Amino acid sequence: KLSRGHSPLMKKVFDVYLCFLQKHQSEMALKNVFTALRSLIYKFPSTFYEGRADMCASLCYEVLKCCNSKLSSIRTEASQLLYFLMRNNFDYTGKKSFVRTHLQVIISLSQLIADVVGIGGTRFQQSLSIINNCANSDRLIKHTSFSSDVKDLTKRIRTVLMATAQMKEHENDPEMLVDLQYSLAKSYASTPELRKTWLDSMARIHVKNGDLSEAAMCYVHVTALVAEYLTRKEADLALQREPPVFPYSHTSCQRKSRGGMFRQGCTAFRVITPNIDEEASMMEDVGMQDVHFNEDVLMELLEQCADGLWKAERLRAGLLTSINSSSPSMKSGGTLETTHLYDTLHRPYSKVTEVITRAAGSWDLLPGGLFGQGFFEDEDGKEYIYKEPKLTPLSEISQRLLKLYSDKFGSENVKMIQDSGKVNPKDLDSKFAYIQVTHVTPFFDEKELQERKTEFERCHNIRRFMFEMPFTQTGKRQGGVEEQCKRRTILTAIHCFPYVKKRIPVMYQHHTDLNPIEVAIDEMSKKVAELHQLCSSAEVDMIKLQLKLQGSVSVQVNAGPLAYARAFLDDTNTKRYPDNKVKLLKEVFRQFVEACGQALAVNERLIKEDQLEYQEEMKANYREIRKELSDIIVPRICPGEDKRATKFPAHLQRHQRDTNKHSGSRVDQFILSCVTLPHEPHVGTCFVMCKLRTTFRANHWFCQAQEEAMGNGREKEPGL
């Protein structure tokens, strides 16, 4: 009794029972063995539900194997025995849970997948149904959580079996393969060792494909998982040392033990990613002796975590401080260990400044959808945000997805939708799979812009994205500036980027329509923001500055600003539009003239003698466009007369405020280059959206207008 049923004699008796299950027996003999095991479990429950879990684990493994027997009678007996093990465990804990049995069933299943051919087939599924039926028909536990807990366990088992079978089918589809492994890792949330195994496997796939940010996030989740496990293990030890006077409450004990070596658990990593809260869902088993996870393992994982973040260029001082504070060796005073850890962290710390200026250049997001129930099945109509590494062009992403699904379904059955507009599935031919792709940008509201002051913060932990589509009230896509409207779509993903996966489903979306004068305000605000951002950079990119200037003041390409001014600010037209919008557009134009003047001054300071003539030409063009705008806008525009800052829309304020400390490093530079400067090869980020649908329909969002602009390098016409 003192050893909780784990005496040498009990071990020998149990091994005899287990031997009957391990060796081939007659049907009648096995039925008697199941009856005897049921009696053993009933008489000695502490053997299976307290202390070491090895006997419970061995029994679960053999009984699960019998659940796959060719004989229906054996499958029924095995299913009923497994149900009895769960039910008895539930009663033993005072009708609270059967965590011990739950955990050992999941662990045994993972071993069976590797050891037993055909596990998970029809026979095994029938056994799972028998277990569910037993739970549903058991009246004694009708008003408890037991029945739902049993359903949850069988659902997890089915998820593991289905994902394992599908992995071979999708071994050439990295996104789907990672999704399947993620579903396994999620199903093993109650089993730290197995969850770590699948997260490590996901990290290897990401490294192989060059998705270093996602690999780093896998390392972060693994490290947080181990930290959380050690926190709870410490709480269990504290409970054993000082048994509580009141009824047992693991949560209260855990709170008391937070002052120990592992006082924070996974919450210490929340500064790196809010997605880390997933690791807090770990189920607890006081008797589980997992000797693999200890302080040394955590130290190794912390080093791996820092190295992974450094390689992904996603380090900053705050992240390293979090890793530092999570390290028990920093607190325990071990000189050699502390010296080694500081040496490991020195390299990332020394690179933090450089990394912050380049981190934004590692993004490429693709939100999207697939159309075609007959091909994509459960994926039909789903929208995803994809994150692609660094300078991946939109055309390359589209071609990769087209080839991927062409290989799966046949090239004659897959089509790309060359349009970013909304697709009605009823208009699609059910014989084909359709893919639709479009480019998106990060979206921040005013509060987020105030909180995300650094460039790093604006390309890390991003959850909302935006794309725009031009339209007119007459139904045409393009029209004159006085009739050109724009629909802005804001997408919210389920998780923040970067994540352990490179594609994340879209949770919901919000649409906002901009009328013609609002489009003018939006487009002109972008021009002002671009010029301000370039002029305020620590290292001004003179080539980009001159290109932006030329696109703003040169006579041959100034149709955009002048067209907006004539359409909305001319005395004969202003009465058609709301006074507040007209006033705002006038203010934006004043800022535009001021920004052009500032950009000319910066350019004049940087140029050499061979560009003096070019500078004088741009100054002359600037004076000309300023004069024309002054003739249109009342009161007249005079440079320097109004220093008030324009109140830009929230999504544009980031352009106004951001500072480019390194050429081509900002996320929104690439976004804007898709509109006005598509030919810049050094810019580093892109966001896109992909939508799939199958009836043999795959819906892929694809900005044809942007691709055309990238092909000819010209600035877009007004309202495009």
UniProtKB/Swiss-Prot annotation:
Cross-referenced Gene3D superfamilies: 1.20.58.740, 1.25.40.410
**What are the protein's GO molecular function terms?**
guanyl-nucleotide exchange factor activity; small GTPase binding
GO cellular component terms, semicolon-separated? endomembrane system; membrane
Q: Note down the stretches annotated as region Interaction with CDC42.
A: 277-638
Major localisation: membrane
Kindly list the biological process annotations in GO that this record carries.
positive regulation of GTPase activity; small GTPase-mediated signal transduction
Taking every annotated instance into account, which residue ranges of this chain make up the domain DOCKER? Answer: 186-638
Any keyword Protease? no
Q: Does the keyword S-adenosyl-L-methionine apply?
A: no
Its localization reads: Endomembrane system
Identify the keywords attached in UniProt to this record, alphabetized: Guanine-nucleotide releasing factor, Membrane
UniProt-listed PROSITE patterns = DOCKER
The record's similarity note reads: Belongs to the DOCK family.
Q: How does it assemble?
A: Homodimer. Interacts preferentially with nucleotide-depleted CDC42.
Q: What else is known?
A: 'Zizim' means 'spike' in Hebrew.
The job of this chain, per UniProt, is described as: Guanine nucleotide-exchange factor (GEF) that activates CDC42 by exchanging bound GDP for free GTP. Overexpression induces filopodia formation.
The domain-related comment in the record is: The DOCKER domain is necessary and sufficient for the GEF activity.
- Write down the PANTHER family for this protein, in alphabetical order: DEDICATOR OF CYTOKINESIS DOCK (PTHR23317), DEDICATOR OF CYTOKINESIS PROTEIN 9 (PTHR23317:SF77)
Protein name (record): Dedicator of cytokinesis protein 9
* Source species: Rattus norvegicus
